């Protein structure tokens, strides 16, 4: 299939919400209007020519309704990913759409929990046949890349539970060395990506800066 039914802008933090709490300041990223120096790369768009829809974008309404009009009713809470699997989404990294960032950890956790519930509701689209509108069963039309995106979201949703289970098992059923090793491993999984990202920000600067 050629072309896109959805064009997905990059999502940024709105200025009013950026000063709402320390939680937003720490985890919300950089606010402001600067689409040119903050253009980012996206693995899926760069390698496969297809991005992921996050719920707000530019639609070809007729094509969207034609391709996404056969979902089962009242069965999908988070519809963004499955819609981009059917309709193909192109990322516009130099166009920014601003939205509020959750002001507290509880609000952010609630949002992520809602997203994860939605991801598990579309897990059936990993199978060869899926439920369509009503009770009819259809051949699953989405691509292998789309199925990988669904699987990857499910994998990421299980990481916190798996790490907690690893810590509990190591501390309750293993020796002190295994417990310490498991703790160091989990801390490394959580901290190293953030530390590397922070270090990269310190040692590099945009090419347009003196």
Language-model regions, residue ranges each:
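Internal catalytic domains of large membrane-associated glycosyltransferases
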Residues: 1-140
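Aromatic-residue detector
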Residues: 3-7, 13, 31-32, 36, ...
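Membrane-entry segments of alpha-helical transmembrane domains in multi-pass membrane proteins
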Residues: 46-52, 71-78, 105-108, 147-158, ...
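Loop-to-transmembrane boundary segments
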Residues: 133-162
């Amino acid at each position: 299939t050629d072309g896109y039914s959805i064009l997905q802008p990059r999502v940024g933090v709105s200025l009013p919400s950026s000063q709402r709490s320390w939680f937003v300041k720490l985890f919300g990223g950089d606010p402001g209007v600067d689409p040119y120096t903050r253009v980012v790369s996206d693995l899926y768009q760069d390698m496969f020519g297809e991005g992921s829809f996050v719920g707000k974008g530019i639609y070809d309404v007729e094509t969207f309704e034609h391709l996404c009009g056969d979902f089962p009713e009242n069965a999908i809470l988070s519809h963004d990913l499955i819609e981009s699997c059917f309709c193909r989404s192109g990322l516009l990294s130099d166009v920014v759409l601003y939205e509020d960032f959750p002001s507290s950890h509880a609000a952010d956790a609630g949002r992520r929990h809602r997203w994860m519930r939605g991801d598990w509701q579309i897990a059936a689209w990993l199978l060869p046949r899926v439920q369509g509108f009503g009770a009819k069963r259809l051949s699953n039309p989405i691509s292998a890349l789309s199925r990988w995106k669904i699987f990857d979201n499910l994998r990421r949703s299980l990481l916190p539970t798996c790490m907690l289970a690893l810590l509990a098992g190591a501390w309750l059923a293993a020796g002190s060395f295994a417990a310490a090793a498991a703790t160091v491993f989990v801390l490394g999984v959580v901290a190293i990506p953030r530390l590397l990202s922070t270090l990269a920000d310190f040692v590099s600067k945009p090419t347009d800066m003196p």
